[in-house]
Amino acid sequence: MAAKVARLAAAASSLPFVCAVYAEEKESKSQLVKPKQLPIYCLPPLKSKYIEEQPGRLQKQFSSIRQTTGRYIGWCKDAFFFAKNGIVDSIQFGKDAYVYLKNPPPDFLPRVGIITISGLAGVVLARKDSRFKKIAYPLGLTTLGISVCYPAQAVVIAKITGKKVISASHQTYEAVRSLWTKKEDASKLQQESKSVTQENKKNREISNVQFESAIESRSSNRTESSPIESWSTKDPLPSSGTVKTTKFKPDPKLMDHGQSSPEDVDMYSTRS
């Protein structure tokens, strides 16, 4: 019985030591964890580079199909709108012509008759001539008949066509003139460049000749005259007998007379 009590007392007394050792082991194990192992504190790579995602084969095929089909779809849209507008305009023109012909003015039929007769006359006149005359005679006579039947409209159309022809001729003239002036300017520039190069060569030759002549003249002058003779002739030394000493005389205006005046020199002493 006593042995059991002793064992229990020993076990109870050893419990704090066991807990302390277990806690120390846990602390030591927790300290061994590195920051890189934690998911929150992962360090970014030192050298980072942005790499664009390259498209795959399927994406490339879809993009090529889209580009090719887009061009054809655009052309089809343009053709569809052009045909649609033409059909709408032709339908509207037919409606207007039907309304106009349903109730025509009294002078319409005679005018149409004159125009048709003039066109047929042109065809008859040019039936045995060349192809150009077969086309020109009917067109000319029909335009003449239209201008006779509708003079006001003919004048307006003639003015508009004349302005267009004048503008076109002016543009062609300016284009030809610009080309001609460009050629002339190029030839002038070539001639000027040639003349400038020739003048530069002449100036260089003249300057070289002058420089050589100047060097020769300087060398000849140095050999002819010595420095001692030139110094003796230009700057002669004064002789000892002719030297004279002059006394210093101060200016009375610059002297300090104090409270006296220059007239009372005999009465007051002056400071120089």
Swiss-Prot record:
<keyword id="KW-0472">Membrane</keyword>
<dbReference type="InterPro" id="IPR019166">
    <property type="entry name" value="MIC26/MIC27"/>
</dbReference>
<feature type="transmembrane region" description="Helical">
    <location>
        <begin position="135"/>
        <end position="152"/>
    </location>
</feature>
<dbReference type="InterPro" id="IPR033182">
    <property type="entry name" value="MIC26/MIC27_animal"/>
</dbReference>
<keyword id="KW-0812">Transmembrane</keyword>
<feature type="topological domain" description="Mitochondrial intermembrane">
    <location>
        <begin position="28"/>
        <end position="107"/>
    </location>
</feature>
<comment type="function">
    <text>Component of the MICOS complex, a large protein complex of the mitochondrial inner membrane that plays crucial roles in the maintenance of crista junctions, inner membrane architecture, and formation of contact sites to the outer membrane.</text>
</comment>
<feature type="topological domain" description="Mitochondrial matrix">
    <location>
        <begin position="127"/>
        <end position="134"/>
    </location>
</feature>
<comment type="subunit">
    <text>Component of the mitochondrial contact site and cristae organizing system (MICOS) complex (also known as MINOS or MitOS complex).</text>
</comment>
<dbReference type="GO" id="GO:0061617">
    <property type="term" value="C:MICOS complex"/>
</dbReference>
<dbReference type="Pfam" id="PF09769">
    <property type="entry name" value="ApoO"/>
</dbReference>
<protein>
    <recommendedName>
        <fullName>MICOS complex subunit MIC27</fullName>
    </recommendedName>
</protein>
<feature type="transmembrane region" description="Helical">
    <location>
        <begin position="108"/>
        <end position="126"/>
    </location>
</feature>
<feature type="topological domain" description="Mitochondrial intermembrane">
    <location>
        <begin position="153"/>
        <end position="272"/>
    </location>
</feature>
<keyword id="KW-0496">Mitochondrion</keyword>
<feature type="compositionally biased region" description="Polar residues">
    <location>
        <begin position="188"/>
        <end position="198"/>
    </location>
</feature>
<feature type="transit peptide" description="Mitochondrion">
    <location>
        <begin position="1"/>
        <end position="24"/>
    </location>
</feature>
<keyword id="KW-0999">Mitochondrion inner membrane</keyword>
<dbReference type="GO" id="GO:0042407">
    <property type="term" value="P:cristae formation"/>
</dbReference>
<feature type="compositionally biased region" description="Polar residues">
    <location>
        <begin position="206"/>
        <end position="245"/>
    </location>
</feature>
<keyword id="KW-0809">Transit peptide</keyword>
<comment type="similarity">
    <text>Belongs to the apolipoprotein O/MICOS complex subunit Mic27 family.</text>
</comment>
<keyword id="KW-1133">Transmembrane helix</keyword>
<feature type="region of interest" description="Disordered">
    <location>
        <begin position="187"/>
        <end position="272"/>
    </location>
</feature>
